Regions:
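Conserved beta-strand termini and adjacent loop/short-helix elements that scaffold enzyme active sites
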Residues: 78-80, 120-122, 147, 225-227, ...
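A conditional alpha-helix N-cap/helix-loop micro-motif detector
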Residues: 75-77, 100, 126, 147-150, ...
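Active-site metal-coordination segments of metallo-dependent hydrolases
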Residues: 24-33, 125-127, 189-193
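Catalytic core of membrane glycerolipid acyltransferases/transacylases, capturing the structured
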Residues: 42-45, 49, 53, 91-149, ...
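Non-catalytic C-terminal accessory region of glycerolipid acyltransferases
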Residues: 112, 139-140, 151-269
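Membrane-anchoring hydrophobic helices of lipid-metabolizing enzymes
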Residues: 1-97, 134, 141
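Hydrophobic alpha-helical segments typical of transmembrane helices
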Residues: 30-31, 106, 132-133, 195, ...
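Short amphipathic alpha-helical segments and helix-helix/interface helices
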Residues: 83-84, 107-108, 133-134, 157-158, ...
Length: 269
């Protein structure tokens, strides 16, 4: 682990300060606003938290590639019984993730013995990232479904659910002009993608929220929470209830781990 910690130190002391000074992608600005206005921190605390936030992000990127290289982290799981309960049923189910912590480091540790795991990932990644991920996941019955512009990935998602498999997808970012659902998060309105909510309610799927948070240099903690909604209610009410449940869990984790918020853009509109 010394090599990883040396990388942590190098990025903390040299890389992050330069990135924050340049602020080329406005991550410093958006992170500061998040801490100042959404978390309610004072100016000095918000500025310091912005630095720590970027340091944590760099560490998680390092951890991600360390996993691809075969490194092992200690994994704690809270709420695993919810996953086991749904896995034991005949029907498949869905998992909603978010851009907090690092789902990829430990989220795929929720391995099913009976159902194939399908993970929706954004296309356009570098070949080294894709190759590294496939190397790690090839023996775990996990299929990666890249998000494509022609929307063909939706057919694979529907096929997987029709085959009673598990489908995992991020549920916090609206891409392009996609349909959205407006909901309050940390005291202000946010547009959440309607796609994951729509698919889940249309297919009458059970849904888990899974968030993976870094708790130390060697350890991540996986939080599994079953999201509730009334499948007998109208479709509109179902979508609202499921959104409420997802956002409530997201806000709980963001309050608990404020430094691990990694949506580096104007998330609140």
């Amino acid at each position: 682990w010394m090599d990883v910690r040396l990388l942590y130190a190098f990025t903390t002391l040299f890389v992050i300060p330069i990135c924050l000074l340049l602020n080329t992608n406005h991550s410093r600005t958006t992170a500061y606003r998040y801490f100042r206005h959404r978390q309610g921190f004072g100016r000095l605390r918000a500025a310091w938290s912005t630095y720590l936030n970027h340091c944590l992000f760099s560490q998680i990127v390092i951890d991600r590639f360390a996993v691809f290289a075969g490194k092992q982290f200690n994994i704690e799981i809270e709420g695993y019984e919810s996953f086991e309960q749904l896995e034991a049923e005949t029907k498949g189910f869905m998992i909603f993730s978010s851009h907090i912590g690092c789902y990829e480091v430990a989220g795929y540790s929720l391995i099913s013995k009976t159902k194939r795991f399908n993970a929706l990932v954004f296309g356009g990644e570098k070949a080294t990232v894709t190759k590294g991920r496939q190397k790690v996941l090839v023996h775990n019955n996990i299929r990666m479904i890249p998000v494509l512009e022609d929307m063909s990935h939706l057919f694979l998602v529907n096929e997987a659910l029709d085959n009673n498999e598990i489908v995992s997808m991020p549920a916090d970012r609206v891409i392009g002009s996609a349909k959205s659902i407006t909901h309050e998060l940390l005291g202000a309105e946010v547009r959440f993608p309607a796609g994951p909510i729509s698919v889940a309610t249309l297919k009458e799927q059970d849904v888990l929220a899974v968030n993976v948070m870094k708790v130390s240099a060697k350890c991540y903690k996986v939080y599994v929470k079953r999201l509730s909604y009334d499948k007998q209610a109208s479709r509109k009410e179902q979508m609202q209830q499921l959104t409420d449940s997802y956002v409530k869990e997201l806000e709980r984790k963001v309050r608990q781990y404020p430094l691990q918020w990694f949506n580096f853009y104007d998330f609140w509109t």
